Curated annotation (Swiss-Prot):
One annotated GO molecular function: thiamine pyrophosphate binding
Top enzyme category: lyase
The protein, known as: Alpha-keto-acid decarboxylase
The entry's keywords: Allosteric enzyme, Decarboxylase, Lyase, Magnesium, Metal-binding, Thiamine pyrophosphate
Family as reported in the entry's similarity comment: Belongs to the TPP enzyme family.
Cofactor(s) of this protein: a metal cation; thiamine diphosphate
One annotated GO biological process: aromatic amino acid family catabolic process to alcohol via Ehrlich pathway
Length: 560
């Protein structure tokens, strides 16, 4: 490989830091998020000088981690840089969320020099006990691979960590001491090696035989989820759905994984909280294929799914099962391809999916009618266009949108497993940086936005023009629905949302406050026309109203 060293860097020597950057560039990373600190400053010089990687500074480390997560979901790899101790601990929540939700993020920590560590002195940003691996040990719980780089083995260790991150689709951790970052080394001699295929021909053959026997002449029904996307098996899943008439649904975690405008798309399955048509089709399917499905509490109606294992083919990351038979090692893509081959080879066509009963279109609300949850999400969904990237924060925004069918080509991002409120605002920065040609739409509650709102200014600095809908329902409405309807701990300070962008350095924006349907309609109409500006719309909703789906989930919730 040709080294990517730039003359813009004052150091003409090719270094370990350059090696790391070139490997990240090879994996598709063209922006790195983070916050400077004295232990990483010289490494940041190399980022700035790199010919294909750009530095994107964040307002704080937590936001940088969230931004890297949003970027990684769309690009398939991302990186965040922090300083030792104080910086890396600040980003820990974001990294844990990336681990839970299978997002490949490389966390690079600038550390003290090896000589300074060797003295075991009480250096700043440490715990003062001379042990400089406390935080490395913490990282082992929330990353799939870790390395404390040493000069002699740095290249090999970088390759190991990056390979694991690429393979497992989870974060990795690299402790890069400032002197190691400057240490001379050779550039990569070959592309980062890929793991050999993880499918046993015998396992695949036995799986195929068992699947043929179970499927017979039945119509397949498919329930798919997030891991299909993370494991880059979407094309194989789409080929399976095209092999016959295959009714299919997703969980909320995998929303937008499949084309929701397809006549064969049933909707969102959420256990007992599902629409009855969806629940009956999934739970009553003669043969159900579950692809990349993880039944978490918040997407399964608190584990109310009723799936018969005897009629289920379950496709996982490294193994699959047919009824009670398990086959491994068997990669997801290979198992999906085998099922598609079975359907195309059996020479029969399944009947078309019966469409739901036609319903009269809802009456258009009066322009002076106060906003409701249903009005807001209906109108937001009608404003979406192919290519939009929609991020819905964990709350009324996420569950309000989950029930709505999205146009083809819209990507939906939420965080229903980790559920860290405020995540989506910085993640929207990362998503917009990853694909600036696709307009980002952020849907977030007032309480969640107060946690991470500093990143509004980053949108402006980076020349991004998202549409941001802030749901002002005067506090933590989801928590009020669960417990403490009038409790003071669910109250928040009221902010002037329409003035906030200017205070945070946004220079090219429009801001609206909508209390009625007409005001919301006007604001979103302007937002659609002004793609050159950030448009913030504050929508004022009753403090106790929640979307239908969220109400059903809360009603079935038991103390966990």
């Amino acid at each position: 490989m040709t080294p990517q060293k730039s003359d813009a860097c004052s150091d003409p020597v090719y270094t370990v830091g350059d090696y790391l950057l070139d490997r990240l560039a090879e994996l598709g990373v063209s922006e790195i998020f983070g916050v400077p600190g004295d232990y990483n400053l010289q490494f940041l010089d190399h980022i700035v000088a790199h010919p294909t990687i750009r530095w994107v500074g964040s307002a704080n480390e937590l936001n940088a981690g969230y931004a890297a997560d949003g970027y990684g979901r769309l690009r398939g790899m991302s990186a965040v840089v922090t300083t030792f101790g104080v910086g890396e601990l600040s980003v820990t929540n974001a990294i844990a969320g990336s681990y839970a939700e299978h997002v490949p993020v490389v966390h690079i920590v600038g550390g003290p020099t090896k000589d300074a560590q060797g003295t075991r002195r009480a250096l700043h940003h440490s715990l003062g006990d001379g042990d400089f691996e406390h935080f490395l040990r913490i990282s082992r719980e929330i990353t799939c691979a870790q390395a404390n780089l040493m000069p002699a083995t740095a290249g090999r260790e970088i390759d190991r960590v990056l390979s694991e991150v690429r393979e497992q689709k989870r974060p990795g951790y690299i402790l890069l001491s400032s002197d190691v970052a400057r240490f001379p080394t050779e550039p990569p001699a070959a592309p980062l090696p890929r793991y050999p295929g993880g499918t046993s021909p015998r396992a695949l053959s036995l799986f195929t035989k068992a699947a043929i026997e179970l499927i017979a002449d039945h119509q397949l029904t498919v329930l798919a989820d997030l891991l299909v996307h993370r494991l880059q098996a979407v094309k194989e899943l789409e080929a399976l759905l095209a092999a016959d008439v295959v009714p299919h649904a997703t969980l909320m975690w995998g929303k937008s994984l499949l084309d929701e405008s397809s006549p064969n798309f049933l909707g969102i399955y959420a256990g007992a909280a599902s629409a009855e048509r969806v629940r009956a089709a999934i739970e009553g399917a003669p043969v159900l294929v579950t692809a990349g499905v993880v039944f978490t509490d918040m997407v399964s109606g608190f584990f109310s799914q009723r799936i018969d294992p005897a009629r289920t083919i379950d496709i996982g990351q490294y193994q699959s099962s047919v009824a009670d038979q398990v086959f491994a090692p068997l990669e997801m893509s290979a198992a999906l391809q085998a099922l598609a081959t079975i359907l195309t080879g059996r020479g029969i066509s399944s009947p078309p999916v019966v469409p739901p009963p036609a319903e009269p279109p809802p009456a258009m609300p009066a322009r002076d009618e106060p906003l409701t949850q249903q009005m807001v999400w209906d109108r937001v969904c009608s404003a979406l266009t192919p290519g939009n990237v929609v991020l819905a924060d964990q709350g009324t925004s996420f569950y309000g949108m989950a029930d709505h069918r999205l146009p083809q080509g819209v990507t939906f991002i939420g965080q229903p497993l980790w559920g860290s409120i405020g995540y989506t605002l910085p993640a929207a920065v990362g998503a917009a940086v990853a694909h600036p040609d696709r307009r980002t739409v952020l849907l977030i509650g007032d309480g969640a936005a107060q946690l991470t709102v500093q990143e509004l200014g980053t949108f402006s600095r980076e020349g991004l023009s998202p549409v941001i809908v802030v749901v002002n329902n005067d506090g933590y409405t989801v928590e009020r629905a669960i417990h403490g309807e009038t409790a003071p701990y669910n109250d928040i300070v009221s902010w002037n949302w329409t003035e906030l962008p200017s205070a945070l350095g946004v220079t090219n924006h429009l801001a609206f406050r909508a209390q009625t349907y007409g005001q919301l309609d006007d604001a979103l109409t302007v937002a659609a026309a002004r793609r050159d500006r950030m448009v913030l719309v504050e929508v004022v909703l009753p403090r106790l109203e929640i979307p239908r789906l969220l109400g059903q989930l809360v009603g079935s919730m038991a103390p966990q």
